[in-house]
């Protein structure tokens, strides 16, 4: 089966797909697929994640964390034998999903302050997730030079985040009073006062 251009437009996203599905003699089906997508509504992103390569914990977290935002554009590639899908280990087969987000609202976890106005580049490559944050806001501070990674989607490994926050020092103390950190830092941070900016 071969198609150079399959177009699917929904209220949540527009897609254009190139598809080649080949049955080789005495071989499993071989898929070569590339989809370009744009004008996505991030609130409906769960319908389009590559869930076959993601652990239930990761899928659940993404489903509850992303509240709103845009997906201006991206691309998905699946290349390889369907017998090897979902390509969890390195081989001649691959699955990649790369896309941008704009003005995303992310509720990281209960008890944590949400991230707003999040612009990022998201990359699912094989069994790994990488996120390069261009900008975001927490309170009235700016999140900058930030990268996040999940080394293994199946089984799920921890989300690791490294970055910087620029803004009023008082926001750092405020963050320590949030439910997620209060037990560890609340007593120490409560009497502190701060002036000026951190960067």
Could you describe each region identified by the protein language model?
Residues 1-11, 20-23, 107-109, 113-159, ...:
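Strand-loop-strand
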Residues 14-18, 73-75, 119:
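Membrane-embedded beta-strand positions in outer-membrane beta-barrel channels/transporters
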């Amino acid at each position: 089966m071969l198609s150079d251009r399959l177009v699917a437009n929904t209220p949540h996203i527009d897609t254009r797909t190139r598809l080649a599905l080949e049955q080789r003699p005495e071989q499993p089906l071989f898929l070569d697929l590339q989809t370009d997508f744009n004008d996505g509504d991030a609130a409906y992103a769960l319908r389009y994640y590559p869930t076959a390569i993601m652990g239930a914990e990761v899928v659940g977290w993404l489903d509850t964390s992303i509240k709103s935002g845009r997906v201006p554009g991206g691309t998905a590639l699946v290349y390889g034998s369907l017998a090897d899908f979902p390509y969890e280990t390195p081989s001649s087969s691959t699955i990649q999903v790369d896309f941008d987000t704009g003005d995303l609202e992310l509720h990281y976890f209960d008890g944590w302050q949400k991230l707003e106005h999040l612009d990022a580049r998201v990359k699912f490559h094989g069994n790994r997730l990488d996120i390069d944050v261009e900008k975001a806001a927490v309170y009235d501070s700016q999140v900058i030079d930030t990268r996040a990674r999940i080394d293994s989607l199946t089984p799920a490994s921890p989300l690791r985040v490294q970055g910087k926050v620029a803004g009023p020092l008082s926001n750092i103390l405020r963050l320590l009073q949030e439910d997620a950190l209060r037990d560890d830092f609340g007593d120490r941070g409560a009497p502190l006062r701060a002036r000026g900016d951190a960067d």
